[in-house]
C-alpha cells in the first residue's frame, strides 16, 4: 500500500485513547502509508482540520467516529468550491455507526482503515435542510428523535445502539404523535405521525431500518412515515412488513417540505434542529466517498 497518497484522520476526541486503533495506524505507517491524525475537541475542529488537509495535499480525509463526526467532516468537505476536494473515508468508532454499517464498512479497524485509504472514491449525495444544515445519513423526527436525543450517555456507552430501543420502551407512557403536513414531488400527506424518516442512508437510532431502500447516489431521498396509530406494529418493523402495515407510508423525492402547527425537532445525523418549517433537498454527487465495491447503498 506504500504507493497510496497521504490521508488525514479526523478522530473524535472520545476515541483518542483507542489502543487497537493506534496499533492499526502504526502497522500501516510501517508499510509506508502516511497518515496524519488530528483529534477534535470542540465544534468547528473538523472544519479547521479539513482546511489543514487541503494545505497538506492529502487525497483522503477520514472521519473517525460516529454519525455526528461523519456529518461534520462531510459538511466541511462539500464547502470546498475551488479545486477538487479530498475524498471522504469512513472509520466507524461511534455508538451506533448507522451510516457506516448500512454502507458495509468493515467493523475491523485495520480493514476499515485500508478501505478508507485505498478504496474506490464514489460520488454520493448529501442532503440540506433550510438551505443551511446538511446531513449525509438521515433526518428523523417525532418520538424516535426525542428518544435518541434523551437517551443517557452512560446507557449508550454500555449498550450501544440497543440503548435507544430500551430507553424508548421505558418512555412509552409519554408517547404523543406530532401533527404535520409533508409535500414532495407528486406527494402530499397530512396527519399525525410518530416517526418521520427522510433518508439518504437507510438506518438510524442504532440499527433501525427506517428507509430500507435508500441509495446514496440516486439523486433522491426516501421518506418513511409511521402514522400515529397502532404504536408497536409501526415502531418495530420486525412485527410486520411495511407492505402489510397501513400505518407505514413510503415515498421518494428530490425534496420534501414539512410544515407543523407547533415546533417539532428533527435529528440530523445526531444534531437536533427544531422549527415548524423544513425544506429538505438532496445535493446530488456532493462529495466523493471511499466505499466497498459491494456497498448496498449504491445503485
Swiss-Prot record:
Question: Per the UniProt entry, what is one GO biological process?
Answer: phospholipid biosynthetic process
Q: Which UniProt keywords apply?
A: ATP-binding, Cytoplasm, Kinase, Lipid biosynthesis, Lipid metabolism, Magnesium, Metal-binding, Nucleotide-binding, Phospholipid biosynthesis, Phospholipid metabolism, Transferase
Q: Which residues are catalytic? A: 271
Q: What does this protein do?
A: Probably phosphorylates lipids; the in vivo substrate is unknown.
InterPro entries of this UniProt entry? ATP-NAD_kinase_N, Diacylglycerol/lipid_kinase, Diacylglycerol_kinase_cat_dom, Lip_kinase_YegS, Lipid_Phosphate_FormReg, NAD/diacylglycerol_kinase_sf, YegS/DAGK_C
**What protein name is recorded for this chain?**
Probable lipid kinase YegS
In which organism is this protein found?
A: Salmonella gallinarum (strain 287/91 / NCTC 13346)
State the GO CC annotations.
cytoplasm; plasma membrane
**Encoding gene (name):** yegS
Q: Where are the transmembrane segments?
A: none
